[in-house]
Amino acid sequence: MKFNEAKAQAVALFNSAEFKERVIEEDASMLRQLAILQEINKHGFITVNSQAGAKTKGKHYETGKPYENMERAYLMGFMLETDAALFIKNMGIKTDKNAVFVPVCSDDIKLPSALDIPLTITKIGFPKETRIDTHFSSALPKSTFESFRKQAKLNKSEKVVFIFCWDSEWGRQGLFKDVLRVLKLSV
């Protein structure tokens, strides 16, 4: 699909019962974020994955050891190449959040996960052992890029770039609001 058609379909997806069921299965706390994510898509950032940012504490169900799970808010997806530079610039100038263009590389290039940006961590026990649960690379293998492009239903002929936004502070809400505010200024 052309970018605007894919954008309209992405916006409509947020209203579908199947999509909401999938969100509930994956992370029910994201339900309250759907309206703002829909607006972000409407303003030209077709999202393929996101997390709002949270902190939770508890005790492990088997070991009884205390743990703390911390998430960074993040958002990733496609934007028209013509809009991306101003968006990234404004995110860097007008917010305390991060936005980067993610280049596509050959599937043959090794991307060590130890060099990725941590997105979700768990601290367990005393002394605290920190485990990285989810992370994102600063480059995308071509096959992953194409998989995301297919998920967004974008034609290969569309001049789009992959954008990754994240909050450096663990557990903080507000990334989505800042992204939407900057999109309204930039796109």
Regions found by a protein language model. Name each.
Residues 60-89, 93-116, 125:
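Catalytic toxin/effector domains delivered as secreted proteins or via bacterial secretion systems
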Residues 1-70:
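N-terminal low-complexity, intrinsically disordered segments
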Residues 31-34, 82, 170, 174-177:
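Generic alpha-helical secondary structure signal
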Residues 97-187:
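Active-site or metal-binding loop neighborhoods of secreted/extracellular toxin and effector enzymes
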Residues 7-10, 14, 40, 75, ...:
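Generic hydrophobic, helix-prone segments enriched in Leu/Val/Ile
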Residues 52-55, 78-83, 184-186:
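Short, flexible beta-strand-to-coil junctions
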